[in-house]
Amino acid sequence: VSDLAGLSAGEHERFRTVRNALYAELLEQGGLIIPGAEDTLEALRARVRMMIVTSSRRDHFRIIHETTGLLRYFESVVDNEDYERSKPNPDPYLEGLARLNLGAEDCIAVEDSVRGMTAANRAGLRCVVVPNALTRDAGFSGAYRVLKDVRDVLGVVEELL
């Protein structure tokens, strides 16, 4: 995009710095918990191991989740500083599987985007998709299941156990 806009490397870096600061400010405003997410995580915690695999920057991820209290449900977090190639490449999920010392056949991914679903599939995972407002009209033909509500993830996990 920078090349198309004719931005120099310095202009690109200044733009990125401003963008990241504005994004961090937006994240600090909170209100990002998906309805039903905490109840679902609480129900799953005693039954399965969970980790987060995200393409988010580490600093942005921390801003989001320091205020939600949801990190207590997860063993580990894989963020964009932990792998070379981002989603839709499988690298983030392969790193997650290595950390858990589990095979893809023993896990599922829960995603909200085509890029995430593609990464999970390329890593050999079954992917359950719970689209968000921005992705609800996307094509998720590679999904193991597409759900309308995050609370329905519990039923899928129950079926697979």
Question: Residue ranges of each PLM-predicted region?
Answer:
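Helix-loop "lid/cap" segments that line or gate small-molecule binding pockets
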Residues: 1-10, 64, 96-97
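Metal-dependent phosphoesterase signature
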Residues: 3-38
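Asp-based, Mg2+/Mn2+-dependent phosphohydrolase catalytic module
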Residues: 38, 42, 48, 58, ...
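Conserved phosphate-coupling serine/threonine residues in phosphotransfer and NTP-handling enzymes
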Residues: 54-56
